[in-house]
Structure formats: structure tokens, C-alpha cells
A protein has these predicted regions:
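Glycine-rich phosphate-binding loop and adjacent beta-alpha segment
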Residues: 220-282, 315-316
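Mid-domain Rossmann-like dinucleotide-binding core that forms the NAD(H)/NADP(H) cofactor-binding site
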Residues: 82, 123-198
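Glycine-rich beta-strand-centered segment in the early N-terminal region that forms part
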Residues: 21-39, 51-94
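A structural motif shared across PLP-dependent enzymes of the aminotransferase-like
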Residues: 94-107
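N-terminal Rossmann-like NAD(P) cofactor-binding module of classical short-chain dehydrogenase/reductase
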Residues: 88, 214-215, 236
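C-terminal hydrophobic helical "lid"/dimerization subdomain
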Residues: 267-316
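A short acidic, Gly/Pro-enriched loop at the edge of an enzyme's catalytic core
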Residues: 206-213
Length: 316
């Protein structure tokens, strides 16, 4: 089978298209014929070595956490799936392996795709969608059906996690403000944002009422957002930086909560997101699609920070 592989830490230049033996699913695992995968910033950040202290890689490595495809075979003890079933998942294994013709996925991570969901959308949704959902619901404590009156600020509202976060917060009943460039503001408004702030304008944040929840999908420093937060606000960063951990130590008596959020793969959460999509309550924006051998170019697009929504890798 074809796979994009890295043999050591580095950038996209380290990616090579190689031929590997088709893997066999062990107990509790499922072999999936991958139709689409998707790019997440954690892919190239881990590959660069920037996260090696907390998320080391084993080489050679095949990147790619998100997959959508068809069940080929199942290991011992796997139930609830059948050969040919259309499925998608966020692979929980630290070495992932989604950017290949076939991928091994834990049965507990795998979810049947809703009728009518295309493979590209199914591959774009898992990691970004679950991160947004968990960051708001679990990290910030936003009630999913009773958030009326809560003011939510989504920083990076046009990105992979952010554009889904805007919609989830809106579905919960919150007043949602998105932060993005002026060029992307119309798209974020289309997703349901009540207000959009253009971060490129120096006066964009003047006179803005404070927020109860800040979902930061860009950086890990609560400092720039403190003046826009209520006294008991919850700040959650899905890209934790040093200050996400240090700020609570420096401000032990503050009623504001600052929290880093790391995704926990949860099939029930993916099913919840699938339900939103099926009801027409969630749109998954795809910035661009690249063939498997062009994974390096897809990474460069992600690194540029200009992608709107998710970047998809077309495998089959």
C-alpha cells in the first residue's frame, strides 16, 4: 500500500511516498480502506519536534489522525461493524497512520458515517470537531442546550477548530463573537456568529462588552484577552502555550479560569457532531483538497495560517 512516511523529525521535506505492507488488524482493531484523511496543525508540529517532550514520535511514522473510509476487516472481539461499512474516526494511537491507503483504527474510536455524508467532510470533522465540542462543553463548562445569555468569544473563528466552535456555541444558545481577518468575516457570519471582530484593525476591540467564555484556537496566552473577559470568565486554549499553565499559578486568587485543553478521543462525541451535521445544524468548511503524494504542500498550506476550515487529503 502507499503511505506518506517520515523517518525523522523535520518539516514537510521529510515526507516520502513509500510502499508498505498492508497491516493486519489485531484484537479490538479495524482495518479501514482510507478514502480521505485531513490535516491538523498537530501533525506538522509533532513532526517538527516542537512537541517531542510531551508527544514524542516513533519513526518511521505515517502521520494523519483523521480518516474516513470503508471497513476491510476486523480483529478478534470487534462487533458492531461489517465489511464495507462507511466509517470515520480520530485515530487515538500517538503515531496515527491515516495518510495511507489503509489504516488501523481502534474499534472504540470508529463511528459509522451518517447517510449522505461525503468522505471529505467525514475526514475533516473528527479531531477539529471533538476539540471544539470538548473545549466549550468540558473545558469552559458551556451547557450544550442552555447557554442563552452567555457571551462566547472564539479566537481563530475561521480555522479548522474555530469555525466548528462558532457553530457549536451558537447551537447551545450563546451570543457568539468570532475573531478573524476581515477577509474571512463574511464566512464566519454565515456560520451564525452574531458579531465578527477583525483582528487586523487596531480599534476592533474598542467598546466590546466582556465575554464569559473565550475559546482560543490560535495561541496559548490569555493575556491579550483579559480585558475582554468578565470577572468570572473561562478561558480555554486548544493550543496550550506556557502562559496557559503559568497564568493560574501567578494569579491564584483570580475567579477567572484559565485552562489548556487536550482532545480526548470519544466516539459518542463524534456521533453527536454527526447528528448536528445530519440535521443541517453544522457545516464543515473545506479549504482545499490535495492528493496523498502532495501531503507536504497541504502541510505548507496549514502552516501558512491562511486556511479557512479544514484541509483534506484525498487518498482513494
Amino acid at each position: 500500500m502507499r503511505a506518506m512516511q517520515m523517518k525523522g523529525y523535520g518539516g514537510s521535506e521529510q515526507l516520502q511516498l513509500v510502499e508498505l505492507a498492508q497491516p493486519l488488524p489485531q484484537s479490538g482493531k479495524v482495518l479501514v480502506r482510507v478514502h480521505c484523511a485531513s490535516v491538523n496543525p498537530v501533525d506538522w508540529k509533532r513532526a517538527s519536534g516542537a512537541l517531542r517532550l510531551i508527544m514524542p514520535m516513533r519513526f518511521p511514522a505515517v502521520p494523519g489522525y483523521d480518516v474516513a473510509g470503508d471497513v476491510v476487516s476486523m480483529g478478534a472481539g470487534v462487533g458492531g461493524f461489517s465489511v464495507g461499512m462507511r466509517v470515520h474516526a480520530r485515530i487515538a494511537d500517538m503515531n496515527a497512520g491515516g495518510c495511507a491507503d489503509y489504516a488501523i483504527v481502534g474499534a472504540a474510536e470508529l463511528v459509522a458515517m451518517p447517510d449522505g455524508m461525503p468522505y471529505d467532510v467525514a475526514a475533516a470533522l473528527p479531531l477539529a470537531g471533538m476539540t471544539a465540542l470538548q473545549g466549550l462543553r468540558d473545558g469552559a463548562g458551556l451547557p450544550m442546550a442552555a447557554a442563552a445569555g452567555t457571551r462566547v468569544l472564539v479566537v481563530g473563528a475561521s480555522g479548522g477548530v474555530g469555525h466548528i466552535g462558532v457553530q457549536i456555541a451558537k447551537q447551545a444558545g450563546a451570543w457568539v463573537t468570532g475573531v478573524c481577518s476581515g477577509a474571512n468575516a463574511p464566512r464566519v457570519r454565515e456560520l451564525g456568529a452574531d458579531e465578527v471582530l477583525d483582528y487586523t484593525r487596531g480599534d476592533a476591540f474598542n467598546g466590546v462588552a466582556p465575554f464569559d467564555v473565550v475559546l482560543d484556537c490560535v495561541g496559548g496566552d490569555p493575556g491579550p484577552w483579559l480585558r475582554l473577559m468578565t470577572a468570572q470568565a473561562r478561558y480555554v486554549s486548544v493550543i496550550p502555550g506556557p502562559m496557559t499553565f503559568i497564568w493560574p499559578l501567578l494569579n491564584p486568587f483570580s475567579r477567572r479560569r484559565v485552562k489548556p485543553w487536550m482532545l480526548k478521543t470519544n466516539a459518542d462525541d463524534l456521533r453527536y457532531l454527526d447528528g448536528l451535521w445530519q440535521r443541517g445544524s453544522l457545516k464543515v468548511i473545506i479549504d482545499d483538497r490535495y492528493p496523498l503524494p502532495s501531503l507536504g504542500q497541504a502541510w505548507q498550506r496549514s502552516i501558512s495560517g491562511r486556511a479557512v476550515g479544514k484541509i483534506v487529503i484525498e487518498v482513494a
